């Protein structure tokens, strides 16, 4: 007597090899871990490149003729970071550039105007979100974290309770909503 066939042929899944591309990896179950690995690898490569540039490991064959005059080595003065740009510190951690905030205290420098009301800035108050200079009347303190915020980056929260108006920075406003 011959063997009978399996009655569940339609329900049985095909057992084929499936190619998993990087796109499926980055959007799949391990998306967070995969993106963290890519971020750490990229940060490490950037840090190694910054260290190599700072320690002058690049050989003499490397051409730097395409750099503008203020950035060529041997000239006095460090390159200025763009507003809001973060720098890699000697320990590999990202730090905010404090050059814009310290420029207000330089003697002989032109007075900086407030970004909201265009008054002369009396202190060194800087918005923690956009790093714009602020005067004493335009600075708001975040109710959640205590950071300084400007009119554009601060969010007024009118609650039902007796506290009245609370100002939140954009980071804290995401969690309050």
Swiss-Prot record:
Gene Ontology MF term list: CD27 receptor binding; tumor necrosis factor receptor binding; virus receptor activity; zinc ion binding
Compartment(s) of residence: Cytoplasm; Nucleus
Expression induction: By ischemia.
UniProt KW Hydrolase keyword: no
Cofactor binding remark: Binds 3 Zn(2+) ions.
Coiled-coil region(s): none
Location of Phosphotyrosine modifications: 34
Subcellular location, principal: cytoplasm
Cofactor annotation: Zn(2+)
Annotated region described as Interaction with BCL2L1 isoform Bcl-x(L) and inhibition of BCL2L1 anti-apoptotic activity, given as residue ranges: 36-55
An individual GO BP term: extrinsic apoptotic signaling pathway
Keyword annotations from UniProtKB, A to Z: Apoptosis, Cytoplasm, Metal-binding, Nucleus, Phosphoprotein, Zinc
Keyword Zinc appears in the UniProt entry: yes
Cellular compartments per GO CC: cytoplasm; nucleoplasm
Tissues where this protein is expressed: In post-ischemic kidney, found in cells lining the S3 segment of proximal tubules at 12 hours and 1 day post-ischemia. At five and seven days post-ischemia, found in epithelial cells of papillary proliferations in regenerating tubules.
Protein role: Induces CD27-mediated apoptosis. Inhibits BCL2L1 isoform Bcl-x(L) anti-apoptotic activity. Inhibits activation of NF-kappa-B and promotes T-cell receptor-mediated apoptosis.
Subunit structure: Binds through its N-terminal region to the C-terminus of CD27 and to PXMP2/PMP22. Binds to the C-terminus of TNFRSF18/GITR. Binds to BCL2L1/BCLX isoform Bcl-x(L) but not to BAX.
Protein name: Apoptosis regulatory protein Siva
Species whose genome carries this gene: Rattus norvegicus
């Amino acid at each position: 007597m011959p063997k009978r066939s399996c009655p569940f042929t339609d329900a049985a899944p095909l057992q084929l090899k499936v190619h998993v591309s990087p796109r499926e990896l980055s959007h799949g179950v391990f998306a967070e871990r995969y993106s963290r690995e890519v971020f750490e690898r990229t940060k490490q490569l950037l840090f190694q490149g910054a260290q190599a540039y700072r320690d002058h490991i690049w050989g003499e064959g490397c051409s730097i003729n395409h750099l503008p005059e203020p950035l060529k080595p041997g000239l006095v003065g460090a390159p200025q970071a763009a507003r809001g740009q973060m720098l890699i510190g000697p320990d590999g951690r990202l730090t905010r550039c404090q050059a814009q905030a310290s420029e207000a205290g330089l003697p002989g420098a032109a007075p900086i105007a407030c970004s909201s009301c265009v008054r002369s800035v009396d202190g060194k108050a800087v918005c923690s979100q956009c790093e714009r200079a602020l005067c004493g009347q335009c600075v708001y303190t975040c109710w959640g974290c205590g950071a300084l915020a400007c009119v554009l980056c601060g969010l007024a929260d009118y609650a039902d309770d007796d506290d009245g108006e609370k100002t939140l920075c954009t980071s804290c406003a995401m969690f309050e909503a």
